[in-house]
Amino acid sequence: MASTIAVLGAGAWGTALASVLGRNGHAVRLWTREAEHAAAINAERVNQRHLPDCPLPDSLTATADLETALGGTDWLLIAVPSSAFRGLIERLAPYRPGKVVWATKGLESESGGFLHDVVQAGLDPAPAMAVISGPSFAAEVGQGLPTAITVAADDADLAAEVVRAFHNDRFRPYSSTDMTGVELGGAVKNVLAVATGASDGLGLGANARAALVTRGLAEISRLGAALGADPQTLIGLAGMGDLLLTCTDDQSRNRRFGFALGQGATVETALASVGSTVEGARTAAELHSLAERHSVEMPICNMVYRVVSGDTPLEQAVRELMERTPKAEFDD
């Protein structure tokens, strides 16, 4: 049965997900902050600014009016950067949405906590919640290339509803109840992609890249264990799957940012060269604090934090990583 769904955030990712829902026959309202942007999307039937190679289905309409976007919807999907997430939740509070789904990846910028905590604290009554994550570049989703993702929810009925809404012969969602693990994988992989990009920018080779991905997964797993995440989640699509994609393909903004650092660019110049949101640069500090609060050792992610914050030159950080005291590969 067709639903009416609000997608809040008309960047590349929000537009790609909205296009999947629209192609599946759902009525989609794509919200952007700018009336001019909404008018252009409606007139041109494409989001030229963020996803120019993705023609939009007729069932999708764009609007800059939040009340119009939300009115009469079955559920809403948030796809804004993590830095804008809390502000949007505050704007949603008067509307008291009953079902909130998000595809934002990262930790909350003010608290350094998980996005589900922001939703629970910011909306009263607390809605049914779900998060979408996994190996999924927006351009490929928009073009209809085969993609598999994870939908984690605190409510089995909402998980099933979101899975049904997205599922087609090119987009395969899997369900999960582990919201913490799915959110964690989506946040940490961005920081690790900065590390692998920097390694490749320095010309450190394929061996180093493989080591960073593998030991990076160990860091995600250690933090996940401390936070109560399901270990299987972290070797699934939202963990290892997204990590592999983001660390090895230049469609990743985080990887391109790290590569620019490895080539000698300053943080500011590297960010400018990417030209759009680099979640890993923002998440590094929040992840550093989160790991410290839980006494979890995350040397690669900590290296990224030190480099991005300007505390340590990249070459020195790499040397310190390699010179750490030898240890067993797996913790007891």
Curated annotation (Swiss-Prot):
Pfam families from the UniProt entry: NAD_Gly3P_dh_C, NAD_Gly3P_dh_N
Cellular component annotations (GO), alphabetically ordered: cytosol
Enzyme Commission identifier(s): 1.1.1.94
Predominant place of localization: cytoplasm
Enzyme class, first EC level, given as a word: oxidoreductase
Positions with a binding annotation for sn-glycerol 3-phosphate: K105, G134, S136, K189, D242, S252, R253, N254
Known pathway: Membrane lipid metabolism; glycerophospholipid metabolism
UniProt xrefs under PANTHER family: GLYCEROL-3-PHOSPHATE DEHYDROGENASE, GLYCEROL-3-PHOSPHATE DEHYDROGENASE [NAD(+)] 2, CHLOROPLASTIC
Protein name: Glycerol-3-phosphate dehydrogenase [NAD(P)+]
Designated gene of the protein: gpsA
